[in-house]
A protein has these predicted regions:
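A general structural motif
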Residues: 1, 75, 100, 127, ...
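Short, well-ordered alpha-helices that flank and scaffold nucleotide-derived cofactor binding pockets
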Residues: 21-25, 98, 121, 173
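A short acidic, often aromatic-flanked loop/helix-cap motif at beta-alpha or helix-coil junctions
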Residues: 45-47, 69-74, 138-140
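A contiguous active-site-proximal alpha/beta segment in oxidoreductase catalytic domains
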Residues: 104, 109-168, 172
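Alpha-helix N-cap/loop-to-helix initiation residues
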Residues: 12, 45-46, 85-86, 112, ...
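N-terminal Rossmann-like dinucleotide-binding module
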Residues: 1-57, 149, 154
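Beta-loop-alpha module in the N-terminal Rossmann-like domain of NAD(P)-dependent dehydrogenases
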Residues: 30, 60-120
């Protein structure tokens, strides 16, 4: 069993609440063996769901870590979340990537090019494999928009930069 550690600004948010189920579903479909086992959050109380890190961990069956270093030592794979706070990713990358464990950094990857470049440089320095993507890249539902001549895009999210991806997918269609 490969242990996944979540690093987040506040842990009770949409991605952290849904990824564990999706990972279990992927295990069943692909025959893999991963589980979200550890979590660390910079901010204890989620401003979105009003849930503490301890409450989230108890609900999800995950062990809370007191530091990012503790989480990295215990985990086989790291997922840096904070999808609504990409300005946090560089600081988390500075702590996570030296552990040389495969790391996923959630979208929006970085707030600007300079920050993204620095994250890549840190990963290269330590030889750490990492990636970032959006599940929306694989949303077949958006394929139905191909050939549309008029389009209105609506959506949630905290800011335009965070949710530019659906716009890009619609333009691509």
């Amino acid at each position: 069993m490969k242990k996944i550690g979540f690093v987040d600004y506040y842990i009770s948010e949409w991605h952290a609440n849904n990824y564990p189920v999706w990972i279990k579903q992927a295990n069943e479909k692909l025959g893999t063996d991963y589980e979200v086992a550890y979590a660390w959050a910079e901010q204890d109380l989620s401003p979105v769901y009003n849930e503490t890190t301890d409450e989230w961990c108890a609900k999800m069956g995950v062990s809370r870590c007191n530091t990012i270093a503790e989480l990295c030592e215990k985990s086989d794979v790291i997922i840096v979340l904070a999808p609504s706070d990409p300005e946090k990713h560089l600081g988390y990358a500075r702590e996570v990537l030296p552990f040389r464990k495969c790391t996923y950094i959630d979208k929006t990857f970085a707030p600007d090019f300079a920050t993204a470049k620095e994250i890549f440089e840190i990963a290269e320095k330590y030889g750490t494999p990492f990636f970032s993507t959006s599940a929306l890249r694989f949303a077949d539902e958006l394929d139905t928009l191909k050939g549309a001549t008029d389009l209105i895009i609506t959506g949630g999210g905290g800011n335009f930069a965070e949710y530019i991806i659906p716009v890009g997918r619609c333009i691509e269609c």
